[in-house]
Regions:
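Short sequence/structural segments immediately N-terminal
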Residues: 1-271
Length: 271
C-alpha cells in the first residue's frame, strides 16, 4: 500500500480515514495483510508499467463481479448473509452504489446522518419517498427514523428486505412491541400475513396508517360475506355477525373490536 500511495496520494489520504485502512495497519476484524491488492488484485505489473490495464478496477466490473470482491470478506457478517439473494443484487445494484470504499469516516463506508442516509435511498426509491409526503407517515423525512431502521439494504429472508429481530420477527415489532403477543386469541392476519396486510408502512391518508382511508374498508376485505348486494342494490346487508353496515354505529369496527391485533381475554377481540 505504501508503494501505491506514491502515485495515488489523494486516494491514500482518503483511505486513511476509512475502516478498510484497519485491514492495512492492524489485525482488527481478522483481515490483516489485505490492503490495496485485496480489492485490486496483483498490482506488480501495474506498479512497473503504470498501465491501468494491468490492475483490476472494481468500478468497471459488473455488479456481480464487484460484489464478489466485497463478499470475499463480508459475506459471513450477520447483516450480509442475504446479499446474494437480495433484490439489490438481482437488480445489479453493486455494493459500491451505496458504499464509498476509500473514503468516509471511521464508523462506516456510507453517510451516517439520518438525512444523508435517507436521501441516498430516496435517490433510487423515488416512488417510496413520495409516500412519505402523505399526511400520516413514519418520521423518516423529519430525520427521526432512517430507512435501515426497517430495511436491511444487504438483504433479508423477509419480503422487501425487512429487518428481522429475535426469531425472525418483522422489524415493526421492534418499536411496536405491544402488538407482538403471543395472544390467547390471535387475529390470524397479524400472525400469518404481517403488519402490511392492513397497514401502509411508508405513508397513508389514515391516522393509523391503514391501507384504506376508513378502518371498516380494511376489515371488510376479509370479513365480508359475498355476495352482499340485496335486490335494491344495497351493499353490506350480510356482513359478519349480521351487522347492518348501513347503520352508522356499525361503520367503525374498532369501536367494539378494540384489540384487533389480538386479545388475552376475548375471542371476538372486544377487549
Amino acid at each position: 500500500s505504501e508503494l501505491c500511495a506514491v502515485c495515488h496520494e489523494d486516494i491514500a489520504k482518503a483511505f486513511a480515514k476509512s475502516p478498510h485502512h484497519l485491514v492495512d495497519i492492524g489485525k482488527k476484524q481478522g483481515f490483516e495483510g489485505r490492503a490495496c491488492e485485496a480489492c485490486h488484485g496483483p498490482a506488480e505489473k501495474h506498479a512497473e508499467s503504470a498501465d491501468a490495464a494491468e490492475v483490476r478496477n472494481p468500478g468497471k466490473l459488473t455488479a456481480a463481479a464487484a460484489d464478489k470482491i466485497c463478499l470475499s470478506c463480508h459475506l459471513n457478517q450477520p447483516t450480509h448473509v442475504g446479499r446474494l439473494q437480495s433484490s439489490h443484487a438481482k437488480d445489479q445494484i453493486s455494493c459500491t452504489a451505496c458504499h464509498k470504499v476509500h473514503a468516509n469516516g471511521p464508523d462506516g463506508l456510507i453517510a451516517r446522518t439520518p438525512a444523508a442516509l435517507n436521501a441516498q435511498c430516496a435517490s433510487c426509491h423515488i416512488n417510496v419517498w413520495t409516500q412519505f409526503q402523505k399526511p400520516n407517515h413514519h418520521k423518516v423525512p423529519e430525520g427521526a427514523m432512517t430507512c435501515v431502521d426497517c430495511h436491511n439494504p444487504h438483504g433479508s429472508i423477509r419480503p422487501a428486505m425487512m429487518q428481522s429481530f429475535g426469531s425472525n420477527e418483522p422489524g415493526c415489532l421492534n418499536c411496536h412491541g405491544d402488538k407482538r403477543g403471543p395472544f390467547t386469541f390471535e387475529h390470524g392476519p397479524v400472525r400469518f400475513e404481517g403488519c402490511a396486510s392492513c397497514h401502509e408502512p411508508h405513508g397513508s391518508a389514515n391516522p393509523r396508517m391503514l391501507a384504506r382511508q376508513e378502518v371498516r374498508l380494511v376489515c371488510l376485505e376479509c370479513h365480508a360475506n359475498l355476495p352482499t348486494v340485496n335486490a335494491t342494490g344495497t351493499i353490506g346487508v350480510v356482513p359478519p355477525a349480521f351487522h347492518d353496515l348501513r347503520s352508522p354505529r356499525f361503520q367503525n369496527c374498532t369501536v367494539c373490536h378494540q384489540k384487533i391485533h389480538g386479545s388475552y381475554v376475548d375471542r371476538d377481540l372486544l377487549k
